[in-house]
Design a protein with these regions (language model features):
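Intrinsic disorder/low-complexity segments
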Residues: 115-165
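The feature marks the mature, well-folded catalytic cores of soluble enzymes
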Residues: 1-117, 124-127, 161-335
Length: 335
């Protein structure tokens, strides 16, 4: 008989759990509640909460709202969103993850320090930007439910830096809601690098302050740190801040062990989940017989021919009930 194990370590992280709890509490009161962007990168969970009354909006739609309640999800938001809420008399239900919130504050503090240094340099007659013509208007967004009309940060190598002598660099997914919120703390002056190869285009004659999106790969982050340390100018300062969520980082070794002990891995996660992409890649590297699905409807029963054990796991945005639903679907067809 086919043996199926659901990974105990999979499921919502603390930040997502808190956001969903806050949404459900408001909806239980009969409150009309809007959420700025998908509350979690999982279409099934979004659909469940939509049926309860949660209304998902983007930034353009928020501009048209007045005198309502809007929930900010765990990913966080840039300062402009709070200012918009103030102008439109919108009550914010802030579910920003504490880890993300702490990271936003650290980046903002570093940015303010850089501005003060920049002002001191300018007062002595020097310019604060290497080439002002390189400062371009930033437009666009990747996550259309969350970043409509929100400025994308500059890509690496475009010359947009904190000051003449320092750069705030964020290792993260360009256009991701969390990254937009982080870059917003610097008035879009931070530089975003998405992958290890991007680090090579940085200006190593500048001081570099390196941070990471909370859900990125710890191994790749360390590779970036090592590269910068080897190439930074002797006259420049380099500081890195390990801002990757430990609940996320610890999932990597745990999911590797889990994936290795089963004939087949069914990885359940929304395809928009950055964390999901990282974890599924880890499953594949350990167990090539790994398959990703968003729901039970995507399961191909032919996958289980000749298989004795199945491990079901997921991202920090995957609800436990969805993994259980996938397990039940498999059992219905394999008895």
């Amino acid at each position: 008989m086919l043996q199926i194990e659901i990974d105990n370590g999979s499921g919502f992280c603390f930040g997502v759990t808190t956001a969903i709890k806050k949404a459900e509490e408001e909806l239980a009161k009969g409150t009309k509640l809007y959420c700025l962007g998908d509350i979690v990168h999982n279409s099934m969970e979004v659909e469940r909460l939509t049926k309860k009354g949660l209304i998902t909006i983007n930034h353009e739609q928020m501009r048209e709202l007045h005198d309502v309640k809007v929930l900010l999800r765990a990913h966080g938001e840039p300062p402009e969103t709070y200012e918009l809420a103030r102008r439109n008399n919108i009550e914010i239900i802030d579910a920003t993850c504490p880890v993300v919130l702490a990271l936003q504050r650290r980046i903002k503090t570093q940015y303010e320090k850089g501005r003060q240094s920049s002002y001191m340099i300018t007062s002595k007659g020097n310019t604060t930007v290497d080439d002002p013509s390189k400062l371009r208007p930033l437009t666009g967004g990747e996550d259309t439910t969350s970043s409509s009309s929100v400025s994308l940060p500059p890509a690496v190598g475009e010359g947009q830096t904190l000051s003449a002598s320092s750069s705030i660099v964020i290792f993260g997914k360009n256009g991701h809601a969390e990254v937009l919120g982080l870059v917003g703390q610097t008035h879009s002056h931070a530089i975003v690098i998405e992958k290890f190869e991007d680090v090579k285009a940085l200006d190593f004659t500048h001081d570099i302050y390196l941070y990471s999106q909370t859900t990125k790969s710890l191994d790749e982050f360390h590779k970036i740190i090592d590269y910068i340390q080897r190439h930074i100018s002797p006259d420049a300062k380099f500081q890195s801040f390990d801002t990757i969520c430990r609940q996320v980082a610890n999932r990597m070794p745990n999911i590797s062990t889990f994936a290795a002990r089963h004939d087949l891995i069914l990885f359940v996660a929304g395809r928009k989940s950055s964390n999901g992409k990282v974890l599924f890649h880890e499953c594949l590297s350990v167990n090539p017989n790994s398959h990703q699905v968003e729901s039970a409807d995507e399961i191909d029963m032919n996958w289980f021919n000749g298989v004795e054990t199945v491990g079901i796991c997921g991202a920090t945005s995957t609800p436990k009930w969805l993994m259980e639903e996938c397990r039940d679907e498999i059992l219905r067809h394999t008895k």
